[in-house]
Amino acid sequence: MKSVLPSTPIVTLKPKIEDSFAITFAPLSLEEIHALADDSANGAVVVMSGMVRNQTDGKPVVSLEYQAYEPMALRVFYQIAADIRSAWPAVNRVVIHHRIGRLQVGQISVLVAIGCPHRSEAFAACRYAIDTLKHNAPIWKKEHWQDGSSTWVSIGACEQSGQNC
């Protein structure tokens, strides 16, 4: 999927103090992410939870292994937040947390949460955040197959293949 925003120059803004970005080996918590996105001015908090599924194109998956270039990935997260605030100025909170390491089927790999006064902007901003993260962040995954083999998946592979990953 292509970005919903026109191409914009790189913004060197510091994220708002209320925002939260992380690359971590620790398990991710829906409740914690929701709380980080919550604000008394919000009418909506939209959370997107990405998880390890049990197959890719019908081929059984047993686990995924994520690696990231953390400093650059965090800069991409900051840029996503800046883009969101430019397109949807009412957004109060942007939360993006991604796991690294080996994850089993059913485990959460990424959580994105957007806090905003109105649901339509929150949904649009959350969709933009996850789509842009998957396309731009230097985070790689290795699919471990049931037959014992494994395959690395490159950044933006979902968009290049035209599939919904």
From Swiss-Prot:
The keyword Transferase applies. It catalyses: 2 [molybdopterin-synthase sulfur-carrier protein]-C-terminal-Gly-aminoethanethioate + cyclic pyranopterin phosphate + H2O = molybdopterin + 2 [molybdopterin-synthase sulfur-carrier protein]-C-terminal Gly-Gly + 2 H(+). InterPro entries: MoaE_sf (IPR036563), Mopterin_biosynth_MoaE (IPR003448). One of its GO terms (biological process) is Mo-molybdopterin cofactor biosynthetic process. It holds the Pfam family MoaE. GO terms for molecular function: molybdopterin synthase activity. The keyword Transmembrane helix does not apply. Substrate binds at M51, V52, R53, H118, R119, K134, K141, K142, E143. Pathway: Cofactor biosynthesis; molybdopterin biosynthesis. Keywords: Molybdenum cofactor biosynthesis, Transferase. Converts molybdopterin precursor Z into molybdopterin. This requires the incorporation of two sulfur atoms into precursor Z to generate a dithiolene group. The sulfur is provided by MoaD. Belongs to the MoaE family. Heterotetramer of 2 MoaD subunits and 2 MoaE subunits. Also stable as homodimer. The enzyme changes between these two forms during catalysis. This is Molybdopterin synthase catalytic subunit. It comes from Nostoc sp. (strain PCC 7120 / SAG 25.82 / UTEX 2576).
